Amino acid sequence: MSTTSLLVQSLPVLAQGAVLTVKFAVLSMVFGLLGAVVLAMMGIRQGEPLEGFERIWVNALAWLARAYVSLMRGTPLLVQIFVIYYGLPSLGISLDPTPAGVIALSANVAAYMSESMRGAINGIARGQWLAAYSLGLSWGQTLRYVIGPQALRIAVPSLSNSLIKDTSLVSVITVTELLRSAQEMIAATYQPLPLYLAAAAIYWVLCQILEWVQRWYEKRLSLPARN
């Protein structure tokens, strides 16, 4: 079989894998960003002049957030995927490959994004907090309506490209994303070079598309807020 015929025959299979890759990346980015916001909120109040039980509670949450981030950033993503998919069943928690992969990627993204999110929140002038408090807003309302929208503009997710590439790791738990689709075609045709190159080209195209979307999103966020 010629290389051209092979690629034409393999394209539908690779396209299905590419669609699943994009779904993995989008879901992981959304859930990871939500997790990053939670982790950032757990740590931003540390250092405030609090007293009694509230101080203990805030410090405990901040410590838990730091421990989680250190653990997730200090261990390989592949190991995290294995722990969730192969390790959790020993605790009675069995997950299908797809949700296990999404959870692993999301947990990893949350750890990496939380620090930039926390830095963005802390980068907002303290006077804006005080002004919101003087208007009667609570801490949560101030974060939601005043600080959060501004911090989001600073901490626009910047993991799009790496996340697309990281999705290839879920192939080890039998998720038929792009890399796994290419491997299945290789097993059937015994022609690894053109198929791996085709998969690499598709990864590159996906990264370029997401990079363009990210630049557009950053430009939208940089515009002054309008009602």
Each predicted region: which residue ranges?
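Transmembrane alpha-helices and adjacent helix-loop boundaries
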Residues: 1-227
